[in-house]
Structures are given as C-alpha cells and as structure tokens.
Amino acid sequence: MTKGTIMQIAQPYLLFLGDVTDPLAAKTARGIYQWRPEICLGQIRLTPETVSLGLTDMTLQQAQQQGAKTLVLGTANPGGVIPEAWQATLLEAAEMGFEIASGMHQRLAEFAPLADLEQRGLTKLYDVRHYDVPLKVGNGKARAGKRVLTVGTDCSVGKMYSALAIEHTLKRKNCRAEFKATGQTGILIAGSGISIDAVVADFISGAVEAISPDFTDHDWDIIEGQGSLFNPSFAGVSLGLLHGAQADALVLCHEIGRPHIRNLPHASLPTIEQTIEANLAAARLTNPKAQLVGICLNTSAISEEDAAQLCQDWSDKYQEPVTDPVRFGVDAVADKILTI
C-alpha cells in the first residue's frame, strides 16, 4: 500500500459513481478523469439515473478483463458515509481482487467484511482522507530538485487546479514536472501523496518533505497547497506546507469577488500585497531564495473580457504573470518557472 510513508494507489482505475444524481457529488471522479484520462478505464453506475462522466459503463468483470486495478469511489455525500446500497458492489470488487480507494469520511475498514478481506490479503483499502503511518518531523535541510508550491488568500481558491494546470503545461513544454498531492482528490488524481489535514500538527512539514524528497530524475515538483495563512481555521496547515515544501517558486491563488474568508464572515480577506509578503517570509525560513512566479485567479464572477483586462492590470501592477487557469491557461506562469 505504501512506498516508505507515501500512499501508492495501483492504476488504472474503474471509477465508482454509485447512485448519485447530483453532478457536484461526482466532482472527485470528474477531476480524476479531467487530469488523468489515461488511467480511467471506465465507470460503474448502480442506476440508469446516476450521473455519467461519459466514460464507458463497465461491470466489475469487464473492467478486470481490461486491466483495472483499483475501484475508486469518486463521489461525495452528506456526512461522508458509505451507503448500504454500495456495499455489495464494494464487497464483490474486493473478493475479485480489486484494490479500493475512497475519499469518504467513513473508513472502508469500518465495513467489517472489507476489513476481513484486506487482512486475508485479498484486497488493499486506501482511505485517502486518513493517514496513520508514522512520519518524521521536518528538518528544513536543503534537498535536491526544484519545487513550486501553490498558496492562497483563502481556502478553495484554486490551488489544486492551478498546480495541475502548471504540471500539464510544463510537460507540454518538455519539462519533466510531477504533481505532488496533499489533499484527498489530488491523491486520487496522482495515485500517491499524503492528506496533510489528516497529519498531526508536529509532522506537517515532515510530511511535505516525504512527499517531495530529494530528486534528480525530473525537473520540478509541483506541490498542491492547502488553506491560507490568513484563514484562522487552516493557517497552521498552510504554514507547515510552506516550511516543508522548501519551494523555489510560489504561485498565489485568489478568487475575484469573494467577500470574506470562507465560512467566516467576520474575517476579512487579506490584500494581495499582504499575502505575497507573508508567504514569502514563511517560505524563506527553509529556502531563502523563494520567489513569487505568478498569480492564478478564479474570475468566474466576472465576464471573460473584464477578466482579461484585470489580469493585464494586475500583471502590470505586480510585475508577475497573472492569469485565470480555466479561461486563459498558465503558459506565462510556466515560462516564468522555467527561468529559475
């Protein structure tokens, strides 16, 4: 299940969509298919009304014949509980030798028949939202390789999307880049990683050092950021990430039009200047040469024309590439990274 301390999920995948009918409930599966279509062999739906990703519908038997290794629960529901209606399919998959990966709050191992099959060596269960493997504390020692970390003015401002877009664009430019996941969906996309918000606080920076250790076999690690130094709920996670990432380059993410810190109407958003200054100061504890290389915006609240003008205005103001990754791509940010 692990390589050292890092979860390693076998590929390719069969994406399990269960019986969900809300497209938003399948956003994890959709993200996997968007960013790693080559590892998604098909989908399995329990009812005709279940949302579809447009993948081939397969039975467990068909997927196994095609070479699928892991059944991935690509959905979410209120409370994160695995419904009883799903359990027969999960049990059949485990009995057939599929590994099973889930980002749900409820652990797969809480379903006793699945836990028994894992203990007997017939399956492997990956609860990517949880992490129980011992870790070392961070040490801040210089590591081989170059690293990008996405940071933000708040949580849920596009740090994972931006990191994946940067990885994709760097690869297109013949740069050997690897996405390093620190959250549940990112782990399922990458097939490996550590869910940082499941790590005991003392070990957060050490976990990031484990996710992105010394490397010389590729050019850049693109590390998925979490939270924000300015979000009172999650700033501790963000600080540990900054220290452990030892990033050479930071990419700042922000949502245009957000009125306040998410779910905290009493907490004001920081200015862009404050966010840049605080993140660089924290990053430079473990990499004194850390620098900002771009700003990625979620401009969905305004028109595309206004967004293009805003990106140009901000680029002039901050003297860095500024873009909306969804609307305009991240070529300019990638080009700046390649100058380091």
Protein language model features and the residues they cover:
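Short, hinge-like loop/turn segments at secondary-structure boundaries
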Residues: M58-T59, A112-T123, A142-G145, I194-V199, ...
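Flexible, glycine/proline-enriched loop segments at strand-loop-helix junctions
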Residues: I100-H105, L149-V157, I194-V199
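Conserved catalytic-core segment of NTP-binding enzymes
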Residues: S102, Q106-L108, Y126-H130, S205-P213, ...
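Walker A (P-loop) phosphate-binding motif
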Residues: V133-A177
